[in-house]
């Protein structure tokens, strides 16, 4: 079949002309350089095949060209094509760009992170959404609109979805309608050609009954694709599926004995490995067969890659794929076993493939083993599998999912969403060195677990201390807000304590979101003031040990899951000049701490956690000094100096402006919690406006030094917040942005603003009472 389409073909990722590779699962054509990145992602992300030098079923190649020519690439680049999204700074790679890091980062974002795919407007219930999408897919496959079905699959529709009302899967519908290309696409995404409908009929039966005999034969080939691909890799032949479904090249190799590299490995280790292979449960055997299938695909693509590339320019260490990439859906043990397959030489790998083909045929036909395995020394996992099953040689029933016959290759190629147990492929020959390495790694892991448990306990104690301190400070703040006179101090904060700022807890019903790395993903966010300390402590996950040395964890009366911040810079590590206004405000604020205590506050301010002599902006002191050098901020801070003005605004006005600042901070923190980084800039502008209005209540040259220090901190923090939020838009298109670090910096700025505003409320309230 000709690979030329109706228009000039270009690479879907960088627009290079004359692409030589195809991504089957994405429906796009890619050039050699971009293909190297696709291969490094793994088959679970992109299944690649050379357009000219690889063997193609005609209908599969037609399906890929149909998708590519009908704009399937726009599915994966939806937001890049939207003019409203151009301001994000992301751009498509060019042919002249370097593979690393420009092309590789773009391709990873496009296919692995799905950063440019159209997002549904409402995803509150992912289960309902996936079900609705799957029903749409069930209806769409009867038509010839391939790109619509690919779009539904990209949004989360399930190719093996069983319609509860109609009792069929999408592949049944496509087979009945004779939609061969739709069937190819569904099989690529994991549809099983052997899955029965409510009456026990398969898609193959539907195609034959409707008179689509070529489609029925193609579905049979898809059903046995795994064993067909393994046999073709060894001998270049496939069964016709009319006279038989299996070709075992074992007999030909034994009789001919062409050379040592082509003969079977008949060592004792190989024989023992074959016995262990026969003793595997059907599920573990299926996993092993899928892993070997992926390794065959890698080796075939490697051979094509080496035969087609310019070795002086393209074949480098960074473009090679020496072993199977890690699949995050698999366990670490299984991923290690998959990668060890690359260490098999040609003879060992051929022996393994022949053993798998023989075992697959035996299990499919229900034949018994030729030799008993009672005396084998099996691992504990394999022995437990044996205890749970009657006989490996029996034909499985429909009800027993673990003892079903070897599933169709269409399902085993890509239907990887099920939870998998580990399957160590090195069980056949475990050397002493591997045993010692595993033992050492286990001891190291146990020591690390013990250390993390101690750290977790320490963090839990610290959390409870902070909880008690916050309750105490809230009670004091409530007391300060009461009219003069004896007022009993409540044991718990009231609802009016929300004026202590930073209270995103006002939003009581909020969907769980993924928190930062120090907490469990998806843990519910609750305010400190309303959640018991023990409950919050149980959610804590320990830091890595290297992150805990001399680091203090502190809280700002905010949800524990999001607004915990580490002090990473101490006072001794920041250099301040004597003339720095920020340093002077810090020192003056520290000197005034004793005055505040003599006025009868009874405790420190709600947000006061700086030490004597330590800058108020200790966490990012250097960044504040750099920011203070800006002319606008310098002029703002200098305006606080001069002849003193003893006047102070009313407490009600200060509280009113403080509430406005608090409201805007809550909006910013909600955006941070929901990872809406594009909302940072407008939120910071609102906060800056509210801070400006609050600062305008006070005289330009206040007489009280605490007021001047707090105003300095308030203005400086607002300017710094704007500066940090602007970093969400990179200065250069495509520049990487560390959003986790940036979010922590933004939260720190919000904390400093809240701290300064709280100090102004406290000072104004106290001065008005005197």
From Swiss-Prot:
Skewed-composition ranges (Polar residues): 366-383
Question: What GO terms describe the biological role, i.e. biological process, of this protein?
Answer: brain development; cell redox homeostasis; cellular response to epidermal growth factor stimulus; cellular response to lipopolysaccharide; dendritic spine development; ephrin receptor signaling pathway; immunological synapse formation; intramembranous ossification
Where is the region Interaction with PXN and TGFB1I1?
Answer: 646-770
Q: GO molecular function terms here? A: gamma-tubulin binding; GTPase activator activity; identical protein binding; protein phosphatase binding; protein tyrosine kinase binding; protein-containing complex binding; scaffold protein binding; small GTPase binding
Q: What does this protein do?
A: GTPase-activating protein for ADP ribosylation factor family members, including ARF1. Multidomain scaffold protein that interacts with numerous proteins and therefore participates in many cellular functions, including receptor internalization, focal adhesion remodeling, and signaling by both G protein-coupled receptors and tyrosine kinase receptors. Through PAK1 activation, positively regulates microtubule nucleation during interphase. Plays a role in the regulation of cytokinesis; for this function, may act in a pathway also involving ENTR1 and PTPN13.
TM ranges: none
Q: How is the protein modified post-translationally, according to the record?
A: Phosphorylated on tyrosine residues by PTK2/FAK1 and SRC in growing fibroblasts. Phosphorylation at Tyr-392 is induced by activation of Ephrin-B1/EFNB1 and catalyzed by SRC family kinases. It is required for the interaction with NCK2 and for GIT1 recruitment to synapses in hippocampal neurons.
Zinc finger map (C4-type) = 11-34
Q: What InterPro entries has UniProt attached to this entry?
A: Ankyrin_rpt (IPR002110), Ankyrin_rpt-contain_sf (IPR036770), ARFGAP/RecO (IPR037278), ArfGAP_dom (IPR001164), ArfGAP_dom_sf (IPR038508), GIT-like (IPR047161), GIT1/2_CC (IPR032352), GIT1_C (IPR022018)
Location of this chain's protein in the cell: Cytoplasm; Synapse; Presynapse; Postsynapse
Which gene codes for it? Git1
Give the region (Interaction with NCK2 and GRIN3A) as residue ranges.
Answer: 375-596
Q: Tell me what organism the protein belongs to.
A: Rattus norvegicus (Rat)
Q: What is this protein called?
A: ARF GTPase-activating protein GIT1
Coiled coil, from the record: 449-483
Compositionally biased, Low complexity: which spans? 574-586
The organism's taxonomy opens as: Eukaryota, Metazoa, Chordata, Craniata, Vertebrata
Using the UniProt record, give the first listed, main subcellular location.
cytoplasm
